Amino acid sequence: MKNLFKKILLVAFAASFCLVLPSCGGKAVIENSVIGQSWNDMVHGDKAVMLVSYTDGFMSGNNTSDKDKITSATDCLQNIEKHVVKEIEKPDDSSFSEFMGKFYLLDFETDYSFWSASSSALEIPEGNTLLTFWFYGDILIVTDVQLVLGDYGVGKSAYFKLDKSAQKTVENLIETFK
């Protein structure tokens, strides 16, 4: 019984460190990934977001440059980072069945033509950022896009596992753009 009590105290002590050490949180997990700098630039305001786009399918986009909606989107993404448990390897295709939606954050102006699958490629201007956020149930894929081909972004991607309580925050983000 004494050993069980010691183990419980040890686990509680270790868990309390994760609450106070930033390296245990979702933000630190994201910052240590290949998209970390771009995430900070776009989600935490080091760069001005010019456009947010949301789609719940692959062919349509709801684009806005409204400052309030951009602020709402970046606030929700900051809340979502709190739900990041860990970075994961690219999951197998069966993990992508619960598609919830896809967001784009851009720090440059464009004619939005790349939202159409029939469009030509859009190369991201040097020094600019386009981040895509794909939500699949408890998986978040973030891509720092260098080139858009039709409706698909080509670039560096990171895959994150979200905790079970993340779904409400993701739904709030989606609701902002419906």
Can you name each region flagged by the protein language model?
Residues G25-K178:
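Function-determining sites in protein domains
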Residues F13-A15, F58:
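A generic, residue-level signal for flexible/boundary positions that often mark functional hotspots
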Residues V11-F13, V34:
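Short, functionally important structural connectors and interaction interfaces within domains
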Residues L19-S23:
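C-terminal motif of bacterial Sec signal peptides marking the signal peptidase cleavage site
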Residues M1-V11:
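Bacterial N-terminal signal peptides that target proteins for export
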Residues A15-S16, I88:
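Repetitive helical segments and hydrophobic/amphipathic motifs
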